[in-house]
Amino acid sequence: MGGVAKCYTLSLTLPKLDKDWLEQFSTSLKESSERFRVNLIGGDTTRGPLNITISMMGSIEINSSIKRSGARAGDDIYVTGSLGAAALCLKKINEGVKPSESELISLNKPIPRLELGSALRNIASSCIDISDGLEQDLSHILKSSNVGAIIYSDKLPLVNSVSNYVKDSNDWSL
């Protein structure tokens, strides 16, 4: 972590050609590419079950990346953004419940914190994206660094809909 994004490849598998979906996807991809100043340099398109794979490439100075294995006892843990909104949106969709507009944006237009990753390069002892969830991804850092952690659930940055869901269900699995 901590590098500068340069370019990416896209592998797209589609079950059928849906021109409206493809146009919306392409427009969003172009907007993101322009926002983060990265270019699509190649990839593949095939027919099959829906699968979208983006591989980002970048550069970083030698020996300056933020690794999973750098955490030390006594370090504080920080989370950027809010947790659970995209997962709650997907859960609602799968249950036939209409998600809010902000939940849809969290699911469909996640914001990678590329600039922050670069800015933390000489500050953070360890770093990871939490695309697999806080518990699972934090455990990667803890195992790699051979340390433990205490999480204070009342300090987690949750949007109101996620906070309400957790209070009502006591389900922290999002």
Predicted features and spans:
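Helix-biased detector of long, well-ordered alpha-helical tracts
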Residues: 1-174
